[in-house]
Amino acid sequence: IFDRHRELIDEPCASILNDERAKAIIRFKATGFPNRKDEDWLHTDVAKKFATDYGMNLGRVATAIHGTFTCDVPNLNTYHAYIINDSFQAGENKGKQLPQGVMLGSINDIAADSRDLIGPYYNRLATNGDSIVQFNTAFTQDCLVLYIPRNTVVEDTIQIVTLLQANVDMMSNRRLLIILEENSRASLLLCDHSSLQKQTLSTQVTEIFVGRGASLDLYEIEETSGSNTRLGQLFVRQEQDSRFRHSNITLTNGFTRNRVEVSLEGEGAETHINGLAIGDKEQHIDNRTLVDHKVPRCTSNELYKYILDEQSTGVFAGKMLIRPDAQHSVSEQTNRNLCLTSCAHMYAQPQLEIYADDVKCSHGSTVGQLDGNALFYMQQRGIPAEEARHLLMYAFAGEVIDNIQIEALRDRLHILVEKRFRGELNRCKGCSLCKQ
């Protein structure tokens, strides 16, 4: 496909995309798609997901944004933009403006005037990514760019709605590049939706650069359909005294694999990574993390929780790497999981590699069921069995949701998670969910 349609792929794109594309396709052809012989893919068979005859919007046919997909969060002021399939579209922000110097748009527009600004960042973290990253780089035709200059605070949450929308089986290759310069601050909400029951596959590569003293809060919420496959990879580089907080919430999905790699490259950098995955039916949710402590006096904290019902499958593999020069590192990783049926499966692989001697690190993983004694106690006091189950599940999930810093989003997620447990949120209905 690539060789046959190379001219069509290149034509609408900035030269920076085409330059990296040429190198990526060589790396991809050398390895091909991963398979289950690779330990990193042992529990996630991705090769068969690419066997479907997907359409790709190589001709860049525009798709209109409908008001249904505003994805409003009550009581939260946001600045909207969209990625429809894999193309950036500006939102209708009714007179709202981003602070001076902030850029949010398509790399094909921004690179025309600011190639020197984007050049040092695009594909710099993802260059050595796996073959899925190389595939994404080879076929990407657009990239959302968010650039925040030094000493700039973006008060409103920037909300990006990603939507898969087509009348045929569709593949999209999304790309995001986020740059925060020194002492800047922002919060970003990514809402991932699909509005159709066709087979869909999305690869998504996000590169984030958090400059010295800068702070970024990133929230990702997936509400897609059972026919959707999502393969997401997030790369983060942090400089001195920077802070990065990331929460990934999977409410509804089909087949999901997320990988987060954080490189702590400046002393005093701090990262917090949280995840909540709720699965039922035959859903598959795979989360993998790597936090690389390269320098002294950095802090990392991870908390991932899974609630798996029916025949769903969960995978968690988290690695903390403490390099020889990373003395006085503090790192904690926690993974807790509930399997509600004997047919649900959870695979957990916490890892800790320490090559420094003056550090404080811990990690642990548990897999269990709902507390039978607690269920009995609640039923003895008149709470119906199903309601008691929901209350215990809700309390279990609450620890992750409570780590979200934005109050309005935290409140909204409490409601959505409760609906999910009650079976009221069992498939994606588009962003109109957020208005219910």
Identify the residue ranges that each predicted region occupies.
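N-terminal amphipathic, basic helical "cap/leader" segment at the start of enzyme domains
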Residues: 1-134, 303, 309
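Conserved beta-strand/loop scaffold segments within soluble protein domains that form the structured core
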Residues: 100, 107-376, 380-383, 397-436
